[in-house]
Amino acid sequence: MSIHIEAKQGEIADKILLPGDPLRAQYIAETFLEGATCYNRVRGMLGFTGTYKGHRISVQGTGMGVPSISIYVNELIQSYGVQTLIRVGTCGAIQKDVNVRDVILAMSASTDSNMNRLTFRGRDYAPTAHFDLLRTAYEVGVEKGLKLKVGNVFTADMFYNDQPDWETWARYGVLAVEMETAALYTLAAKFGRKALSVLTVSDHILTGEETTAQERQTTFNEMIEVALETAIRVG
């Protein structure tokens, strides 16, 4: 057991999907995994382990934001030995050629969070996806006929921001905004693990188009299928 996860040793697979929403974790377990059992209910942050195409896979809710995902990634790696971590979440598009429901593979993540500035003493660090996962996810998406977007995302510390300045990030090619990827990639690098974020565009910051809360919780299956297939293909 760790502070925030009550699983016993061996109950969590070495490959795990990380949705922010614990109810999405439950949806993934019930919809895609065989024989799924719940190993964590602490703070309502549900975690499950089952099998996908015969491969053992876990799925763990992380909550929203850098501090929350950092807690779960640290404990999953240090207390349970997880090797491969794939975030499956939502993001807001800031490019005109990115549409609601598009799937984005986050190659890298810019951020306004001070986590890395504190870690690296004021210097910049470039949080980056693991190449094997990124390449495999792209190949899986192409096989499924998806129009994937691959590029930089922006990990924001604030959801409600009075001075967001998305225009600057968009001008430099950032595809979308979310709240966790920079932390995931940094911690994976620190501990020598593999990490990737597979994101579905849930809303468009430029146009105002958005999906419903129910859709965010129980749809977006293409993203989940890409993540699961990627997890079982990469050793």
From Swiss-Prot:
Enzyme Commission number: 2.4.2.1
GO molecular-function terms, A-Z: purine-nucleoside phosphorylase activity
Positions contributing to phosphate binding: 20, 24, 43, 87-90
Domain of life: Bacteria
One GO process term, biological-process aspect: purine nucleoside catabolic process
Keywords annotated in UniProt: Glycosyltransferase, Transferase
Gene Ontology cellular-component annotations: cytosol
Residues binding a purine D-ribonucleoside: 4, 178-180, 202-203
Subunit structure: Homohexamer; trimer of homodimers.
Family annotation (PANTHER family): FI09636P-RELATED, URIDINE PHOSPHORYLASE
This protein's name: Purine nucleoside phosphorylase DeoD-type
Source taxonomy: Bacteria, Bacillati, Bacillota, Bacilli, Bacillales
